[in-house]
């Protein structure tokens, strides 16, 4: 199916009243004044064809109280540029780690060490998966490149677009619209409203924002944006997710990079405002810290920066050259691959210029990961081969390895099943003692851990440093959502594009917990049977691995039962001795309706 082309008419205009001064200066969003309630009449920013009925009521005071705007620092935080010592240290670690990984696999694949083939090869796949990710991380750590700030030297015409879908909280979208309006650099705002919501339409009229809707939902988010691009005429098109609130200086920090005519897009950090809401939000955020920090800084050096769908600025000519935003569940990666194949380059700005939301509920997180897994694997199978010859060597490597991230679901399943089989059926994956195995595997694992800590010296924000175990446990416990997404891509099952639920009601998700409960029960049965049959050190090691896996599965299964946990909290709250425990449970496990600033 041929993607439509878009007209691109260059325009020149002077700043509008309300656009604001585009000089970089303190301007916290908290100074935004809600528009005054107006009656019929007056200029409207709504799309053509708006009805002549009385406008819907926009309760600005209620919206701002429920969705308070962020306060921004006068200048964005930039990570410290890596010193020569940092680079030398990380490269030495990368070299040592590569040697350790190679030595381990040469030793492991010794024919004398191989056990039962039906256990050895799945275990080898699991270990190889970890090794590939270590090598990918180290290659990016070894060449960090932080671009210097470039102020815009000319006036650009800019369109900022965000989307709205039925079911998304209108307050969240309206807060983003207010923040878009407060961006100081002159620009034109667009709301791409799939549902033609009357409240959003009226808010756009009051704010002077162009409201665009359409009669169908073809190509989901990409089609929604492309529909608005047919009306927009700016030289730069910025795409914001509706939950991402931009800073007033967003455009000031990215536009200067477009002075190079070969730059097709500029991506900034995807940061969050609710990462401390609960265990799920914290884990989901921590899964991204390394990617948006040291890894993307390294990809920038290799010319392989990835557009991530939110807070990305595109040169309009670049988008037009590929027929607009590419469609799909991973439309951001698809668009990136096509832009690189067309010869465009990119810049990564390692600054927090927007803050959004991560899922706070288990259903929201699992649906998001399943969608990304299916979309990324579909790109690897169908798009990557078509653009392969037009990508650079590092782009080829990254866009081959990146979709494999979602194979972690299969790897987690292997990590659970192998100990179960060894305990229940006496299978042997490796004919070696555990001390020898740990002695060969530990160097690579330790180097990986140390390298991450060194690379975190140029993390974006201080709270992004650490071991990120919460993110690992959450991903391990949601193995089936990754695996289901991969299988849907392999079998050609089309998943609908559904916006990720970021905040939901307290509810129990026993259906989502069943895969974990079944796997954990199998671990417990295998441990009991295996140890009753054989008390050998080997069986004790397998039992240890089974306990480790089952504990993670049960923890994530428990966290998904929001209503039950809330009832437990209310019961324990009646007992004074349990008040400290109750407060801790509420902080870690319970996803409430509060908005975390």
Segments (PLM) and residue ranges:
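N-terminal signal-anchor transmembrane helix
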Residues: 114-118, 128-186, 568
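Acidic donor-binding segment of Leloir-type glycosyltransferases
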Residues: 177-217
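The conserved acidic donor/metal-binding loop of glycosyltransferases
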Residues: 241-245
């Amino acid at each position: 199916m041929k993607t439509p082309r878009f007209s691109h008419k260059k325009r020149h205009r002077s700043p509008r009243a309300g656009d604001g001064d585009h000089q970089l200066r303190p301007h916290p969003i908290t100074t935004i004044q809600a528009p005054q309630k107006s009656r019929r009449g007056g200029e409207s920013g709504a799309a053509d064809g708006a009805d002549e009925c009385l406008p819907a009521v926009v309760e600005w005071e209620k919206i701002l109280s429920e969705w308070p705007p962020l306060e921004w620092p006068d200048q964005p935080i930039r990570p410290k540029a890596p010193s020569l010592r940092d680079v030398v240290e990380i490269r030495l670690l990368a070299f040592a780690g590569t040697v350790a990984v190679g030595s381990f696999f040469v030793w492991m694949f010794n024919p004398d060490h191989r056990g039962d083939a039906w256990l050895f090869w799945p275990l080898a796949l699991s270990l190889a998966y970890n090794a590939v990710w270590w090598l990918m991380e180290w290659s990016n750590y070894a060449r960090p490149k932080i671009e210097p700030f470039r102020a815009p030297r000319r006036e650009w015409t800019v369109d900022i677009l965000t989307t709205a879908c039925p079911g998304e909280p209108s307050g969240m979208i309206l807060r983003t619209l207010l923040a878009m309006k407060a961006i100081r650099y002159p620009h034109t705002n667009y709301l791409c409203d799939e549902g033609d919501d009357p409240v959003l339409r009226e808010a756009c009229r009051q704010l002077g924002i162009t409201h665009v809707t359409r009669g169908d939902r073809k190509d989901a988010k990409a089609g929604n944006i492309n529909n608005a691009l047919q009306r927009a005429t700016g030289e730069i098109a910025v795409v914001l997710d509706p939950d991402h609130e931009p800073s007033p200086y967003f455009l000031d920090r990215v536009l200067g990079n477009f002075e190079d005519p070969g730059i097709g897009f500029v991506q900034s950090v995807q940061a969050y405002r609710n990462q401390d809401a609960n265990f799920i939000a914290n884990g989901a955020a921590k899964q991204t810290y390394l990617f948006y920090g040291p890894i993307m800084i390294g990809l920038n050096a290799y010319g392989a920066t990835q557009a991530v769908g939110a807070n990305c600025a595109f040169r309009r000519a670049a988008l037009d050259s590929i027929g607009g935003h590419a469609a799909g569940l991973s439309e951001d990666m698809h668009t990136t691959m096509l832009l690189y194949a067309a010869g465009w380059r990119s810049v990564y700005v390692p600054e927090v210029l927007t803050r959004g939301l991560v899922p706070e509920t288990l259903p929201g997180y699992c649906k998001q990961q399943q969608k990304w897994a299916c979309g990324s694997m579909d790109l690897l199978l169908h798009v990557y081969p078509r653009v392969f010859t037009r990508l650079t060597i590092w782009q080829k490597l990254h866009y081959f390895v990146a979709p494999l991230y979602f194979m972690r679901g299969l790897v987690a399943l292997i990590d659970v099943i192998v100990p179960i089989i060894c305990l229940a059926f006496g299978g042997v994956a490796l004919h070696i003692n555990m001390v020898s195995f740990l002695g060969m595997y530990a160097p690579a694992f330790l180097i990986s851990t140390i390298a991450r800590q060194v690379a975190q010296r140029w993390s974006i924000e201080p709270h992004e440093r650490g071991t990120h175990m919460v993110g690992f446990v959450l991903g391990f416990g949601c193995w089936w959502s990754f695996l289901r997404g991969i299988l849907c891509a392999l079998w050609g099952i089309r998943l609908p594009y559904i916006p990720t639920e970021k905040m939901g009601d307290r509810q129990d998700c026993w259906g989502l917990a069943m895969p974990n409960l079944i796997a954990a029960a199998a671990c417990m049965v295998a441990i009991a049977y295996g140890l009753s049959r054989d008390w050998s050190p080997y069986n004790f090691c397998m039992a240890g691995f089974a306990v480790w896996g089952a504990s993670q599965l049960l923890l994530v299964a428990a966290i998904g039962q929001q209503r039950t946990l809330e009832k437990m909290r209310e019961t324990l709250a009646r007992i004074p001795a349990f008040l400290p425990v109750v407060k801790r449970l509420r902080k870690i496990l319970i996803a409430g309706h509060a908005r975390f600033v």
